[in-house]
């Protein structure tokens, strides 16, 4: 009996940890759509046909950033924020279903020459990735956002 209670507690904590680790609602982990009136600065990103420029951005926890994204390439591109595991899943889905339309708060779709904005608040310190998940683009078109502690 004495060994059962610690085992049950261990199982309960392990189950809780697994369920949150596998949570598909990654928007909570990467922040949330930001308020345009609370933007602290603007970061310009350019999408070329094989990379993002710059490939790394540093922000501070709690900061609201206005990303101005320009497609400087010759093909349609996307910019999707998320953990790399989720970006890989998105790239696989785009490969399997290339004609399916997507619309997430942490996604921007751009035609060649087009420019759009994404306003995002970074609520937790850590690393967040961004990528173009379109077929043939993902392997080279990705970057990192480093969210530093306040």
Residue ranges with predicted function:
Residues 69-71:
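Asparagine-centered strand-capping/turn motif at beta-strand->loop junctions
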Residues 85-96:
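Short aromatic-acidic-glycine turn motif
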Residues 6-15:
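Bacterial N-terminal signal peptides
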Residues 22-25, 51, 104-150:
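Extracellular/periplasmic metallocenter environments
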Residues 78-82:
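Beta-strand signatures of extracellular beta-sandwich domains
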Residues 22-38:
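A eukaryote-biased signal for short, well-structured alpha-helical docking elements
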Residues 95-104:
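Short beta-strand and strand-turn-strand segments in soluble, beta-rich domains
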Residues 35-64:
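N-terminal edge beta-strand
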